[in-house]
Design a protein with these regions (language model features):
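Positively charged n-region of N-terminal signal peptides that target proteins for export
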Residues: 1-5
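Exported/periplasmic ABC-transporter solute-binding proteins
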Residues: 24-76, 80-90, 97-290
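Bacterial N-terminal signal peptides
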Residues: 7-18
């Protein structure tokens, strides 16, 4: 229910229904990855009633769309789910792009109970690539039970798919189209896994309860299983993760700084963690243990 309400709120914000009359002079415009837009949509009411700042989230797009809008000064904040590259900065030489980390998105290859009970505990990149490309169709081919594999994947261009494609192919553009069963988001993926035999989908580890849903480890180059933990992601050992960043043109000031400060505050971080993301405190603690 929470995710359905948030989707409605996001639509409401994008249409500008929360702005009385014309857009307020100090409204902060933002767009980019949906992964970050969802928790920020939950912050709209608090920002307006307590900080007197209107946050307007523009519909559609992803990280690239957000950066393009920021670089052309049509938004004040780009919502990004990857680190900036030299090419990003070269594309907008007039912009002084500054980043503010707000969390980490950590995903796992989650499987249904029957796959886990059948003995599967980990997959290599080559095995996962074979499943994605349809060359591996039964779990017994990768050490699991004799069950048909049912892989559910987010649409191409969605955040979860991009993390998966980057891991398997190095560059997103090299990944083939996904023509199999699709899920629209984390909640749908979780429900589908729970009730579909032989199923696999991408889920935050926090959403796997080890009663009905189970997170697989990933085999590294030496064949060693690497668990989907914050510590392993922070140390660069676990590949299915990416940063969540707010990007501004120059150091944030005025209403933009209010929004950034809110998202890194305790209240903003609770919104980040509500969606299964890793908050800054936990991430920094893991990095300190390197």
């Amino acid at each position: 229910m929470h995710h359905r309400l948030t989707s409605l709120l996001l639509l409401w914000v994008c249409l500008g229904a929360g702005i009385s009359g014309a857009m307020a002079q100090d409204a902060v415009r933002a767009c980019g990855t949906v992964s970050l837009a969802l928790p920020m949509a939950d912050a709209v009411v608090a920002l307006r009633t307590e900080q007197h700042v209107d946050l307007v989230l523009r519909a559609g797009g992803g990280t690239e769309t957000g950066l393009d809008a920021l670089g052309t000064h049509t938004v004040d904040l780009a919502l990004c789910s990857r680190n900036l590259t030299p090419a990003d900065r070269a594309d907008y030489p007039q912009a002084q792009l500054k980043t503010a980390p707000v969390g980490l998105q950590l995903l796992s290859l989650a499987v249904s109970r029957d796959v886990w009970v059948g003995g599967l505990r980990a997959l290599s990149a080559e095995q996962a690539r074979g499943i994605y490309e349809g060359r591996i169709n039964n779990w017994k081919e990768v050490g699991g039970p004799d069950l048909r594999i049912r892989l559910f994947m987010a649409e191409r261009g969605r955040g979860q798919w991009e993390i998966f494609a980057q891991w398997l192919y190095g560059e997103i553009r090299k990944a083939p189209m996904w023509n199999g069963s699709k899920v629209k988001g984390i909640e749908e993926a979780r429900n589908t896994l729970e009730f579909t035999p032989g199923s696999c989908a991408l889920l935050p580890p926090a959403f796997t309860d080890y009663r009905n849903l189970f997170a697989l480890s990933i085999l590294d180059g030496a064949g060693r299983p690497v668990q989907p933990t914050v510590a392993n992601a922070a140390q660069g050992k676990y590949p299915l993760s990416r940063p969540l960043l707010l990007v501004t043109d120059d150091n944030p000031a005025g209403p933009v700084k209010v929004v950034v400060d809110f998202m890194v505050s305790e209240r903003g971080q609770e919104l980040i963690k509500r969606y299964g993301y890793i908050g800054l405190e936990e991430l920094q603690a893991a990095q300190a243990r390197k």
